[in-house]
Amino acid sequence: GSRSMRMLEDSEFKFKIPRYADLLMDTYICVTLPHIWSPIYPPQEREHVWAPYEFKWVENLGVEMIKEIEISVGGQILQKISGSYMKCLVERDFNTDKKNLFNKMTGNIPEINDPANSGGRVNMYPTAYFSESQNGAEPSIKGQRLYIPILAWFSMNSKMAFPLVSLQYNELHVEITLRPVNELFVIRDIEKVGTDIRPTRGAPIGNYIQPNFNNQLHQFYRFIQPPPNPTTDPNSTLYTSLRDIIQPDYYIQQRNNWAADIHAIATYAFLSDEEVKAFALQPQNYLIKEVYQTEYKNVVGTQKVKLETGGMVSNWMWY
């Protein structure tokens, strides 16, 4: 199926886990992020100022992009978890070293969500501007690959590895629902840049906002390609001045998708012949934690919320 993400709708990806070995252990979702060139919006009037977009991905990008993970066998759902749940689980249960490793794997690093303060910079965003060099403009945020661990019961402990060898007539399926792209990054509101420039504070710029893809100035194609050079590369744009960047057809290439190459990676384990026979002939029982997530809206001030629980409850989390 498609390996790209939708701009305005949830994206669903279904993975059938093949029986390449006897046990399934660590499982990851791999997502490739594109290079990001965050351009600058030139002044349209004499009293206006230059307005940078200052594109950045949201914090905890790898887990926040996951809306839901559903694990099932033979049509029966075994576990459902969300990216928010995994984030809370990491914050609560992981030690500092494991937490730092998890953040690097899932893109929760300054190079992705705070480029103005990464690579030795201090509040200096690396805005992309068209260049006459052979290599072109340097990306504001370099593309990289995220490896997002699926924190299901079988991936947290090797003793709980999923027994694929016991699946004689059924298959293990993992279904991932990812949030739309417009919920995964923020930009400056370049249309609300002030004109009150003072030496002590510089030019006032707009607040960070979620992009509105109904606005031509917020289209994703403006960030996944270098800014066109109207001087040295006339084939890249129909215009001759950077001030025309506000025009809807300033960018000739207006494709919003990129090669996200979304796929699953898993760690398998092999058993001896005696162990395979034991798994295949004897019933295997596992204690699986079911995750229930409830959203409470309009909680203002001191209020009581109703917690509906049943059976044995190991813990609650609020966030």
Language-model regions, residue ranges each:
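Flexible assembly/topogenesis modules
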Residues: 1-319
